[in-house]
């Protein structure tokens, strides 16, 4: 379960049109959701409130093994109207899950607002602050978009003069592929009272660069990611097909081979240098992601490949090589595996994990065999009803034409029905533009249908090479989001259970 602050930050990126996945630090995000999911370490309770679309508050309480808490405040320049109660929020958006992200797009500038001959739209920004109790640590994050393709981040951590043994990390610091999570950091001789982390991101869709600087250890870093075969600002596949049909086929043009995985490649790397610790690091990575097929599919089209992501990471300094494969094998099951090896010492590690969406769909809850469900007011929209009728009509006509069983009476009846719809305010549509028109006319209906179709629970499991087994269950129970996890050591006979945790989140 992701935190409320991370949930707000992702919605803010979506509102301003910023590519959330087009970063080198997010190269292994798909496989990490199945193999590196975090378990609740204790009993955690989090309450979040949204008094206005641009201001949010959050309160967290950690009861075990000692009582800790925090208070958070977030404000944004862009109203986030989609964030509401825990029951109205899509469950798939508040958890880390298997996901194939769409191709990145070039960020567009903010809409111009003029008043008295001057532009007054302002600049996009997000401000976040969190106070940790009783240690009185203060952490925060400030992000703003300087240009349509340039964004700046400033994360800070302030602590009292006598720091405790456990110190929180700066919020939303991107992970590094050159350091392993199990490696302990080098203890500083005299801890500083705080730290400031500065990041500058330049995203053009095809290319993304990230420049970072940490004040505490004087570390300067550079991360880059390049997308091959990027078509963010070019014509779509449908437009290309129509243009080819108009122009005709060239003499030297060959037939396209069907089948296989159709996707896009992304390659990147990172370099960092610490002046105080006199350390240097480098890593490179490669990712292949399948591209969803263009709808509607032709009748003779091959079966589309399942959503798949393959990643390869290599650190030449320590000789660490890691490869991961993740795929969605069914609509409710996704699997992933990762193999890492050190080419210098030949030490290796294998991890296997997956997720299984369980529970009944929200739209089917409360239904009985004796009574039909009551239709929602938005589902009785006449425009959407006409869309469904036109879709059924198109499918029926295509089926009859293929079977050559259309009678003269049926043809006359269908012609009369089509003539009536020409004078109807509801236009005749195909499957290509039916979804677009439905979103334009009734934008609130699609989120409601997604909420009714989604499942309210997911079960995750992973098994690592050292025979540690982790199990996590995340679900929506009424208006609360619940996460329960257990970590077990299959080789330990005296104490096989390492940790058990429970986390409850409530959005209002």
UniProtKB/Swiss-Prot annotation:
**Could you identify this protein by its name?**
Mitochondrial distribution and morphology protein 10
Q: Offer one Pfam family short name for this entry.
A: MDM10
What's an example GO BP annotation here?
A: protein insertion into mitochondrial outer membrane
Q: Name one GO cellular component term.
A: ERMES complex
Transmembrane segment boundaries: none
Q: Where in the cell is it found?
A: Mitochondrion outer membrane
Topology relative to the membrane: Multi-pass membrane protein
Signal peptide, first to last residue? none
The protein's organism comes out as Cryptococcus neoformans var. neoformans serotype D (strain JEC21 / ATCC MYA-565)
Q: Where is this region: Disordered?
A: 160-195
Q: Tell me where it mainly resides.
A: mitochondrion
Record keywords: Membrane, Mitochondrion, Mitochondrion outer membrane, Transmembrane, Transmembrane beta strand
Q: What is known of its domains?
A: Lacks alpha-helical transmembrane segments, suggesting that it resides in the membrane via beta-sheet conformations similar to those predicted for other outer membrane proteins and porin.
User: Superkingdom of the source?
Assistant: Eukaryota
Q: Which family does it belong to?
A: Belongs to the MDM10 family.
Its function, per the record, reads: Component of the ERMES/MDM complex, which serves as a molecular tether to connect the endoplasmic reticulum and mitochondria. Components of this complex are involved in the control of mitochondrial shape and protein biogenesis and may function in phospholipid exchange. MDM10 is involved in the late assembly steps of the general translocase of the mitochondrial outer membrane (TOM complex). Functions in the TOM40-specific route of the assembly of outer membrane beta-barrel proteins, including the association of TOM40 with the receptor TOM22 and small TOM proteins.
Quaternary structure?
Component of the ER-mitochondria encounter structure (ERMES) or MDM complex, composed of MMM1, MDM10, MDM12 and MDM34. Associates with the mitochondrial outer membrane sorting assembly machinery SAM(core) complex.
Under the heading InterPro entries, the entry gives:
Mdm10
The answer to whether the entry has keyword Mitochondrion is yes
């Amino acid at each position: 379960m992701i935190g409320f602050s991370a949930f707000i930050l992702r919605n803010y990126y979506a509102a301003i049109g910023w590519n959330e996945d087009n970063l080198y630090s997010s190269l292994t995000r798909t496989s990490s959701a199945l193999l590196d999911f975090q378990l609740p370490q204790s009993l955690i309770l989090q309450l979040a409130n949204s008094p206005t679309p641009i201001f949010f508050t959050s309160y967290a309480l950690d009861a075990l093994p000692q009582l800790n808490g925090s208070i958070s405040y977030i404000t944004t320049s862009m109203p986030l109207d989609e964030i509401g109660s825990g029951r109205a929020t899509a469950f798939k958006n508040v958890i880390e899950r298997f996901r194939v992200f769409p191709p990145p797009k070039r960020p567009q500038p903010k809409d111009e607002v003029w008043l008295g001959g001057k532009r007054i739209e302002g600049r996009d920004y997000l401000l976040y602050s969190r106070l940790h109790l009783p240690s009185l640590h203060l952490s925060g994050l400030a992000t703003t978009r300087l240009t349509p393709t340039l964004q700046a981040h400033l994360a800070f951590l302030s602590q009292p003069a006598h720091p405790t043994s456990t110190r929180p990390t700066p919020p939303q610091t991107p992970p590094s592929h050159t350091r392993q999570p199990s490696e302990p950091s080098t203890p500083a001789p005299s801890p500083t009272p705080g730290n400031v982390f500065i990041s500058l991101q330049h995203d053009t869709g095809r290319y993304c660069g990230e420049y970072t600087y940490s004040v505490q250890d004087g570390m300067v870093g550079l991360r880059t990611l390049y997308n091959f075969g990027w078509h963010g600002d070019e014509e779509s596949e449908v437009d290309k097909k129509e243009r080819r049909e108009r122009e005709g086929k060239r003499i030297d043009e060959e037939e396209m081979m069907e089948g296989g995985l159709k996707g896009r490649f992304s390659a990147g790397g990172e370099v960092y240098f610490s002046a105080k610790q006199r350390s240097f690091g480098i890593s490179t990575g490669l990712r292949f992601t399948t591209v969803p097929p263009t709808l509607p599919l032709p009748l003779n089209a091959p079966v589309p490949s399942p959503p798949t992501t393959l990643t390869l990471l290599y650190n030449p300094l320590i000789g660490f090589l890691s490869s991961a494969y993740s795929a969605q094998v069914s609509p409710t099951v996704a699997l992933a595996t990762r193999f890492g090896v050190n080419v210098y010492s030949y030490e290796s590690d294998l991890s296997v994990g997956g997720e299984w969406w369980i529970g009944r769909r929200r739209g089917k809850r409360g239904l009985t065999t004796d009574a039909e469900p009551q239709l929602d007011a938005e589902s009785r929209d006449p425009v959407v009803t006409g869309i469904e009728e036109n879709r059924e009509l198109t499918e029926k006509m295509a089926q009859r034409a293929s079977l050559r069983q259309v009678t003269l009476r049926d043809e006359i009846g269908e012609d009369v029905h089509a003539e009536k719809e020409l004078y109807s305010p509801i236009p005749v549509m195909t499957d290509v533009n039916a979804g677009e028109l439905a979103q334009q006319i009734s934008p609130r209906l699609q989120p409601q249908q997604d909420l009714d179709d989604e499942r309210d629970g997911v079960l995750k499991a992973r098994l690592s090479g050292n025979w540690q087994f982790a199990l996590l269950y995340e679900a929506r129970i009424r208006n609360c989001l619940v996460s329960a996890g257990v970590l077990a050591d299959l080789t330990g006979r005296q104490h096989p259970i390492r940790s058990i945790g429970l986390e409850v989140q409530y959005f209002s």
